[in-house]
Amino acid sequence: MRPSGRAADALRSISLTRHYTRHAEGSVLCAFGDTKVLCTASVLAKVPPHKKGSGEGWVTAEYGMLPRATHTRSDREAARGKQTGRTQEIQRLIGRAMRSVFDLAALGEYTVHLDCDVLQADGGTRTAAITGAFVAAHDAVSTMLRDGLIAASPIRDHVAAVSVGMVDGVPVLDLDYAEDSSCDTDMNVVMTGSGGFVEVQGTAEGAPFSRADLDAMTRLAEAGIARLVQHQREALGLA
């Protein structure tokens, strides 16, 4: 039995609350159980230097955790004067995930800048950030269409993410902190709505995992992401 009482293939309770803040072109509070991430999408009328004059836009992300998002307080990275390697890794992952489903030429020379701030962490913050950031980005694009900044949506597909792992030899979906801190294998999977893999990050924390374990975990992730995409569609009124 999992600590939460969930079945091995069960997601936590998922919610995607749109228009959570007032000023951003897109904002979503994404909750995976007790993990809560505020995802905002801002439209900027500029692009990074490597895109200037190309006619293409850019999608990028920043990620951070509030000081008391975890069991004990941690200093703000701004107070320490630099980002941790973990923060840099996660925000690059979010950016790659979003760009995988954007047609940058259709975006024009605009940047969609995503800010993902963890309000409360109970495992799976990066997967919640990706899943919520897509909905925020979708709302930002809708704002651009409404305001006549672009002629057609640059979004080609949905993208979402979930964690999977091996706990006592059993593949489980959407690990919370208790499972994440004690599992033998921890894996994060990012996929598109059409079933394409964007990223697979897997590490054996204890016993090495077999090819059969890998296949079982990716199948579990695929099924979980299909359900997350359905949550996105329902939140956006597309279901």
Swiss-Prot record:
CDD domains: RNase_PH_bact
Catalytic activity from the UniProt record: tRNA(n+1) + phosphate = tRNA(n) + a ribonucleoside 5'-diphosphate
Top-level taxon: Bacteria
RNA-binding in keyword set: yes
Keyword annotations from UniProtKB, A to Z: Nucleotidyltransferase, RNA-binding, rRNA processing, Transferase, tRNA processing, tRNA-binding
EC number(s) from the headed UniProt entry: 2.7.7.56
General function of this protein: Phosphorolytic 3'-5' exoribonuclease that plays an important role in tRNA 3'-end maturation. Removes nucleotide residues following the 3'-CCA terminus of tRNAs; can also add nucleotides to the ends of RNA molecules by using nucleoside diphosphates as substrates, but this may not be physiologically important. Probably plays a role in initiation of 16S rRNA degradation (leading to ribosome degradation) during starvation.
PANTHER family recorded: EXOSOME COMPLEX COMPONENT, EXOSOME COMPLEX COMPONENT RRP41
Protein name, entry field: Ribonuclease PH
Naturally occurring in which organism (per UniProt): Cupriavidus necator (strain ATCC 17699 / DSM 428 / KCTC 22496 / NCIMB 10442 / H16 / Stanier 337)
Taxonomic path: Bacteria, Pseudomonadati, Pseudomonadota, Betaproteobacteria, Burkholderiales
Underlying gene: rph
